Amino acid sequence: MTDKRKDGSGKLLYCSFCGKSQHEVRKLIAGPSVYICDECVDLCNDIIREEIKEVAPHRERSALPTPHEIRNHLDDYVIGQEQAKKVLAVAVYNHYKRLRNGDTSNGVELGKSNILLIGPTGSGKTLLAETLARLLDVPFTMADATTLTEAGYVGEDVENIIQKLLQKCDYDVQKAQRGIVYIDEIDKISRKSDNPSITRDVSGEGVQQALLKLIEGTVAAVPPQGGRKHPQQEFLQVDTSKILFICGGAFAGLDKVIANRVETGSGIGFGATVKAKSDKASEGELLAQVEPEDLIKFGLIPEFIGRLPVVATLNELSEEALIQILKEPKNALTKQYQALFNLEGVDLEFRDEALDAIAKKAMARKTGARGLRSIVEAALLDTMYDLPSMEDVEKVVIDESVIGGQSKPLLIYGKPEAQQASGE
């Protein structure tokens, strides 16, 4: 290109690559006798990203962990739920093996292994999905089924889920197509009765219908980054058949549906098996016997259930399991708060009786593992507020009375004679 820059002031500068003037672009970057505009920089970045995409699949082919390795990794972060972890490990392994080898093997078409997690609040459904995504280093996004509506109604369109997934990987379509989507509260979109209604159920059966193609596999058209700012740009085409969908819900009352089916099978009249109250199965035992017909009676449509072939049930966490969750996983709650206090140069000790009290409180609230953090946060709030302004504190001790609200944490100072409770 000829030199379009002139020495006199007020003369235009031009991009050395596309020839646009400084008034036609937002930014013109100067180098030794050359200039490049922001549009050409963006184009260069796109070219580099495309090159990286072509190399990435070859790296990924050797990175798929075995079901045993997936299960072991889940054990590091999730307490209990052994059967659910095994089911998830196999389903996830099969899904990514299918992606690596194409949708067919020796002429046999391989179906998607989308997953349905059934279990009470705070049992670890979301944590399992998040942990899997971290292990596999794939994009992960969550959606709340209760906010979804059919296209054309007020609410969140189901295809917004794919947009969120794209945002997590900087709109890299290839990465998004290897991602995991977790849809929570899926039980809340059950239809209101067993019989289809002539009236529209835009937040129930209608959403199930809208999710069908997305979960099974379709090419979703998603606005590019910037969306409405650049209407002339073509929509991104995302193949959802390669995305793993995990749906989760508490399904309150499903155990009763299963119990009715199981008990009906025991017979009536003189030949009936009479069961004592003590023989009744627990909620967890009943959920483990779930069949597609139970989910249909609960309010999920048959087509939707068919798109979620892998079903894993999670048990309500016991008090012992909650205590384990507090101290054993790699990112256990007590370890997180101890790390926070260490940043202040202070040790934090949770006595065993304190852990028992935290677990008991969570059990009473029926919040499962999800409620543990709020209990610990409330117990430590005043201490975390005062500690940065205090001097010579070496250790903070939490016992049962602190969790119960009867006393303040014990503060241990550097000088033995200065030991005192912060509440004194």
Curated annotation (Swiss-Prot):
One GO-annotated biological process of the protein: cell division
Domain ClpX-type ZB, residue spans: 2-56
Transmembrane feature ranges: none
GO cellular component, one term: HslUV protease complex
Record-listed ATP binding positions: P120, T121, G122, S123, G124, K125, T126, L127
UniProt-annotated binding residues for Zn(2+): C15, C18, C37, C40
Record's signal peptide: none
Organism superkingdom: Bacteria
GO terms, molecular function: ATP binding; ATP hydrolysis activity; ATP-dependent protein folding chaperone; protein dimerization activity; unfolded protein binding; zinc ion binding
SUPFAM superfamilies in UniProt: Glucocorticoid receptor-like (DNA-binding domain), P-loop containing nucleoside triphosphate hydrolases
Keywords: ATP-binding, Chaperone, Metal-binding, Nucleotide-binding, Zinc
NCBIfam families: clpX, PRK05342.1
Family, similarity comment: Belongs to the ClpX chaperone family.
Purpose: ATP-dependent specificity component of the Clp protease. It directs the protease to specific substrates. Can perform chaperone functions in the absence of ClpP.
Subunit structure: Component of the ClpX-ClpP complex. Forms a hexameric ring that, in the presence of ATP, binds to fourteen ClpP subunits assembled into a disk-like structure with a central cavity, resembling the structure of eukaryotic proteasomes.
The name this protein goes by in its record: ATP-dependent Clp protease ATP-binding subunit ClpX
Organism (species): Citrobacter koseri (strain ATCC BAA-895 / CDC 4225-83 / SGSC4696)
Gene responsible for this protein: clpX
